[in-house]
Amino acid sequence: MNRPIAESFLNRADHRVLRRILLPLSLWHLLNLEIAKSPYFFGNTFPLVKDLRIAVTICTTLFPQLPDFSQKRLMGDWLRSWRCNFLTETAKFRCYLEDFNALPQLWKKPEIRPSGERESVGLPWALAIVTSVCGSTGWSAETVWNMPVGQAYWYHVAFAMQKGCSVDLLSEGEMEAIERVRAKKAKQ
């Protein structure tokens, strides 16, 4: 069996960061992390304590609720977690992200666009996945937005393949070869 498939359907349910139990990482959480410009989503800067508290608040909120960023909530989070070691909690949050981020590994075809041609803008990726899975299954938007991200993405890819889309998944051997090359480059 393809390792990312197994990883996306077999997740730990005991992720706890800043003494709060996190929900399975969902498209709703990723959308909110993106909107909040979270360093945990973009990875462009090292997160601050405030970034971790915001990310934890987001990842404890179900669709369609909005995360509670009120001063009262953030102060309560601070009081509950002020003795926590920030680096340890950040490592735990990154472990949580990695546990649920088991997406299909696809071969990407190079895009060749004539010079001067306008870049096309499609649906935001999270919305595209939600509409695809809802349209293919009849499941409610709430069910799909709250579904673990790996599962939703795998369903999306599977339905696309069933509809005849050309999707080229990486094999186990190809993924291992890519990992070996990355490890070799990292040592250089």
Residue ranges and their predicted role:
Residues 1-50, 54-63, 73-167:
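An amphipathic, hydrophobic-aromatic interaction surface with interspersed Lys/Arg
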Residues 68-71:
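Extended accessory and catalytic-adjacent subdomains in large enzymes
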Residues 159-188:
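Accessory, usually C-terminal, subdomains that scaffold auxiliary metal cofactors
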